[in-house]
Amino acid sequence: MSRNSLWISTFVLLIFCSHIVETKGQRLPVPDILKATSEADSTYLPDFSFAGYHNGESAIPVSAGTRIHATDYGVVPNDGLDDSRALKMAIKAASTLDGKVTLQLPAGRIILSDILYVERSNFVIRGAGTGANGTELHCPRPLMYVKDPVELTELREYLIEFDKRQREKENNIDLPFSQYAWSGGFIWTKVPNTRVKSYLQKYDKPPTVLANIASGERGDFVIEASAIKDLNVGDIVELQLFNKEGKRGALMFGLYKDQVAKVGSHHWNFPDLPLVKQQVEILKIEGNTITINAPLTIAIKPSYKAQLVAWKHLEEVGIENFKVTFPKAPRVAHHVEQGFNAIYLTRVYNSWVKNVIIENADSGIITEEIANVTMRNIVTQGENHAHYTVMMQGTYNVLAEGIKVYNKAVHPLSFNTFATKSVYSNCEVFVDPILDQHSGANHQNLFDNIKVHVAPNSDRSYPLFAGGGAGYWKPSHGAFSTFWNIHVHFLDGLDSELPITLNGMKDGPLARLVGITANHNVQVFYEPSAYIASINQVLENVPSLYRYQLERRLK
């Protein structure tokens, strides 16, 4: 090749490469809803970036503090004998130590048949990993064979008093609900002698009120108090909003924007039960003006009788690096689960669960009354038909990311009662997926960058957005719940050019669905008054709304 020819070839190559760089360097447009400047309901998008450990602003710690070894208290892996007593002794010993403490579990199989209660802050249960040479907690029998937990006394009475039963005439089933259908776990965080969830009014006790709140705007961090008592900067407290005005109370409009025909009776039959709760840190107090660390989900009106109350909780609790296994067991019926539940998180704040595999569970992780928690890299698998995998119930600013669901479950990913401003991000469901929103005043939650594997129905539809929950807690969710960059991998139905319909939701007001794509054209139906955009368009520019909002906030 002549020098002149070589120069021409190089010049052409440089032009081609510069074109590629220029193309790749172009700023791709962001979805229109991210450009909206108005606070109008039609385009309002919550800021979900406050979800997770320390509002997503700090990495989960790796330092162990004082490390104690379970083997020093009698745990012997791989010997086929029960280790429950030894594990409880190790946790008791940890409770006597000051500062950060890590209970290190050995590699191998550890047998657990009783509940391990975690009742202190700054405590981590850590295994050796989830691989072949990691740690396995094997639970050979369900919680139904454990002594009835005193913490579930109120729930047990409620189930009996209200005759809560699973009735399936076609299957000859008429059985009482299990106390473990949505509660309890073999690893159980709790504040001693503290109620977690309200079921019966006779157990109600007046909270410690620290401030009465008169007003505040949606999305703001500043609230105005009418009275303040014993409230200090740095306090972690609970903001509560009530409906004391009956069936047509103003808070119903705040939650559902008058978009649904039927609102369940629990919204007005229990006027002393807060329908909206946020666990927040007090950043500043100037006179009657209070600044909190996260934005309000709903504008506060005087009729909501809003208040800040003391909130008992644990902090800096970690559960990580092990596998929990249960034996194969036949499924009896929905709500009649025996109690193969791995982890029950209650009343924890700025805490985490990470790198855990859960096999053959009825429910992998159940939550109640938790905030600013990250659940990361959790795998659920097995042959048993689960109720829940990693569920969100009574959550605020909770992040579940990297969840992989390989097993069949009634509610694979679920925002349940009182889940608020919480996020499933970068998750994948391989079997019968449903992005469940389970009623109970859950609102402003986000399904973010989710992949699901679907076998569509014979009519070329699939109820991906089906909402569960009891009628007395309907509708399925409040305004502004969001689906962002949802990718559907259809397993069949690809032999026709007709679009496949994704549906299932008829009582989910003002949802946001942006970037629903598949390996086949889809159409989306979601009611009522949903904002639907970028269907069949991959959101390469903003694949994760949570990450996009977090990065912008932390700039």
Predicted feature locations:
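Bacterial N-terminal signal peptides that target proteins for export
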Residues: 1-9
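Right-handed parallel beta-helix
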Residues: 122, 315-326, 349-360, 371-384, ...
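Extracellular beta-rich repeat passengers
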Residues: 192, 202-206, 210-213, 367, ...
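Beta-propeller domains
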Residues: 274-280, 284, 290-305, 309-320, ...
